[in-house]
UniProtKB/Swiss-Prot annotation:
Binding site residues for Ca(2+) 3: 159, 161, 163, 165, 170
Covalent lipidation (N-myristoyl glycine), chain numbering: 2
EF-hand domain boundaries: 40-58, 60-95, 96-131, 146-181
CDD domains per record: EFh
Entry similarity comment: Belongs to the recoverin family.
Extra remark: Probably binds three calcium ions.
Binding site for Ca(2+) 2: 109, 111, 113, 115, 120
InterPro entries (UniProt xref): EF-hand-dom_pair (IPR011992), EF_Hand_1_Ca_BS (IPR018247), EF_hand_dom (IPR002048), Recoverin (IPR028846)
Record protein name field: Visinin-like protein 1
Role played: Regulates (in vitro) the inhibition of rhodopsin phosphorylation in a calcium-dependent manner.
GO molecular function terms listed in the Swiss-Prot or TrEMBL record: calcium ion binding
Binding site for Ca(2+) 1: 73, 75, 77, 79, 84
Length: 191
C-alpha cells in the first residue's frame, strides 16, 4: 500500500467532525501529522510501541503500549488507521467522564468478555508500573503498594458482589462514587 491521500475526503471529514470532539481544522492538522509519521496511513504495533517509548523513556512501555494498541484497534486488524487513532484520542483527551470510563474498562478487559478479572487488572497495573519506571513509580506510589496490593485495593472498592470480577456497571459506579479509584487505576495516588 503506497502513500495515502494528503487530504481527508469530505464525507470522512464530516463523519469525524460528528464522531469526535475535534473541529475540521484540528482534524486536518492531526491527519497531516499522522501521515507524516505513518505514510502508509496505518500504524502497526511496533510503530505504536516506539511512540510510547518516546513518552516514557525511563521505563519499559512496550507491554502497556500493547494494551493501548488493542484498545485503539477497534476492528482488530492489527493496525490503527487514522479513524481509530483520532476517535481514541478524542475520547482520551476530550471525551466525557463516561466515555473515558468505557475506554478504560475496555483496556482492562483483556479478553473482551465484559468483565475484568484480577489477572486482567494485574496485567495492566504491572504494565503501568513498568512503563513509568522505578524512580517515578516510587514518587507516585506514596503508599508503597505492590501491583498485587493495588489490585486488591481496587477490587475491594469496585467488586461489590465479591465474585472476583468487575462488570462495566460496577466499574462505572465505583469510579463515579469514589474519584480516588480512578487515581488508583492510573497508579497516580498523589493528593
Amino acid at each position: 500500500m503506497g502513500k495515502q491521500n494528503s487530504k481527508l475526503a469530505p464525507e470522512v471529514m464530516e463523519d469525524l467532525v460528528k464522531s469526535t470532539e475535534f473541529n475540521e481544522h484540528e482534524l486536518k492538522q492531526w491527519y497531516k501529522g499522522f501521515l507524516k509519521d505513518c505514510p502508509s496511513g496505518r500504524l502497526n504495533l511496533e510503530e505504536f510501541q516506539q511512540l510510547y517509548v518516546k513518552f516514557f523513556p525511563y521505563g519499559d512501555a512496550s507491554k502497556f503500549a500493547q494494551h493501548a494498541f488493542r484498545t485503539f484497534d477497534k476492528n482488530g486488524d492489527g493496525t490503527i488507521d487514522f479513524r481509530e487513532f483520532i476517535c481514541a484520542l478524542s475520547i482520551t483527551s476530550r471525551g466525557s467522564f463516561e466515555q473515558k470510563l468505557n475506554w478504560a474498562f475496555n483496556m482492562y478487559d483483556l479478553d473482551g468478555d465484559g468483565k475484568i478479572t484480577r489477572v486482567e487488572m494485574l496485567e495492566i497495573i504491572e504494565a503501568i508500573y513498568k512503563m513509568v519506571g522505578t524512580v517515578i513509580m516510587m514518587k507516585m506510589n506514596e503508599d508503597g503498594l505492590t501491583p498485587e496490593q493495588r489490585v486488591d485495593k481496587i477490587f475491594s472498592k469496585m467488586d461489590k458482589n465479591k465474585d472476583d470480577q468487575i462488570t462495566l456497571d460496577e466499574f462505572k459506579e465505583a469510579a463515579k462514587s469514589d474519584p480516588s479509584i480512578v487515581l488508583l487505576l492510573q497508579c497516580d495516588i498523589q493528593k
